[in-house]
């Protein structure tokens, strides 16, 4: 079983609770609006990190981040591919027709897990500052040996 931590919209705040929730990840996906490369440095101390640029990522390092990313979530013979982007309204392809099992996105700060056409559309919500009266969350994907994907949203206890 492979565990993928998913985080988005940290906006410069990486909560200790988020780090704890992601600590057993084999891979971490950040769906944008990071708010500084220091956050990625901390996350990369846990597991390899993939990131896409969000609409508020203006710092110097962010200029090199892709707007879209393809990530292999599984190891072995049955590949499980994820397509990452920050804003789902910028989705520029039909994920099921090109073989993606998961679309990971952020931007709205609203956690979401929805299956459509055999594809999981997954937004971990926002892990940074609370906004819009929404919970502070991260996500987790699990991929088993047969390539089956399961997902969960983890609501964080706030200490800030």
Sequence positions of predicted segments:
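N-terminal active-site segment of His-dependent metallophosphoesterases
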Residues: 1-49, 57-67, 134-137, 160
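Structural motif
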Residues: 4, 27, 80-82, 102
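Short, solvent-exposed aromatic-acidic interface loops
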Residues: 150-160
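Conserved beta-sheet core of the metallophosphoesterase superfamily
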Residues: 50, 81, 88-152
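General small-molecule cofactor/ligand-binding pocket signal
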Residues: 5, 50, 72, 152-154
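Helix-adjacent hinge/juxtasegments
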Residues: 50-90, 97-99
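Active-site metal-binding loops of divalent metal-dependent hydrolases
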Residues: 8-12, 32-34, 55-57, 86-89, ...
């Amino acid at each position: 079983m492979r565990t993928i931590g998913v985080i988005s919209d940290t906006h410069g705040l990486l909560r200790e609770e988020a780090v704890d929730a992601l600590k057993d990840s084999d891979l971490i996906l950040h769906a944008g609006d990071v708010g500084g490369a220091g956050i990625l440095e901390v996350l990369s101390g846990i597991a390899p990190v993939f990131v896409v640029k969000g609409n508020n990522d203006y710092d110097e390092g962010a200029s090199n981040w892709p707007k879209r990313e393809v990530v292999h979530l599984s190891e072995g013979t049955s590949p499980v591919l994820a397509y990452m982007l920050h804003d789902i309204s910028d989705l520029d392809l039909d994920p099921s027709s090109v073989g993606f099992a998961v679309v990971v996105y952020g931007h709205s700060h609203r956690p979401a897990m929805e299956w459509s056409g055999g594809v999981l559309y997954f937004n971990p919500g926002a892990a940074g500052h609370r906004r819009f009266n929404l919970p502070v969350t991260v996500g987790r994907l699990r991929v088993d040996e047969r390539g089956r994907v399961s997902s969960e949203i983890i609501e964080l206890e706030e200490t800030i």
